[in-house]
C-alpha cells in the first residue's frame, strides 16, 4: 500500500534492516526511505494509507502491522517495537498517533 512512496532499493534496504525481531528503528527506517526529506503533506498522505480504518489515527494494531503496508511478507512489529514506536510519536498521550503526530515523528 505504501511501496509506491519510495524507491524499491531503499525499501529493500529498510526492510532488511528490521527483519529480526526487536530490530525496528523508526528513525532509521524513515531516513532510509527518504521520508524525512518529503513535504509534510506527502508524509500525511502516507499516514492516511496506513490508517486502515480511516479514523484519522494510527492505533496500536495499525502500528503493529506497519511494515506489512510496505511489503505484505514483512513481519508484524513486536509488542516492544510497537510500544516504542507509539511512545516516540504520541505527543498528547492518547494512545494513538494522529496524522500530524505521525508527520512530526517521520521528520525527526
UniProtKB/Swiss-Prot annotation:
The keyword Lipid metabolism is assigned to this record: no
Record's keyword annotation contains Nucleotide-binding: no
InterPro entries in the record: EF-hand-dom_pair, EF_Hand_1_Ca_BS, EF_hand_dom, Parvalbumin
Matches recorded under SUPFAM superfamilies: EF-hand (SSF47473)
GO terms for cellular component: sarcoplasm
Function statement: In muscle, parvalbumin is thought to be involved in relaxation after contraction. It binds two calcium ions.
Protein name: Parvalbumin beta 1
Organism field: Oncorhynchus mykiss
Amino acid at each position: 500500500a505504501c511501496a509506491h512512496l519510495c524507491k524499491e532499493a531503499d525499501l529493500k534496504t529498510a526492510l532488511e534492516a528490521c527483519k529480526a525481531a526487536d530490530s525496528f528503528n523508526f528513525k532509521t527506517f524513515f531516513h532510509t526511505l527518504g521520508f524525512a526529506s518529503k513535504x509534510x503533506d506527502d508524509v500525511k498522505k502516507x499516514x492516511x494509507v496506513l490508517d486502515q480504518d480511516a479514523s484519522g489515527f494510527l492505533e496500536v494494531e495499525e502500528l503493529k502491522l506497519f511494515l506489512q503496508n510496505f511489503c505484505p511478507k514483512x513481519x508484524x512489529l513486536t509488542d516492544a517495537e510497537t510500544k516504542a514506536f507509539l511512545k516516540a510519536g504520541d505527543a498528547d498521550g492518547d494512545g494513538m498517533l494522529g496524522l500530524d503526530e505521525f508527520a512530526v515523528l517521520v521528520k525527526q
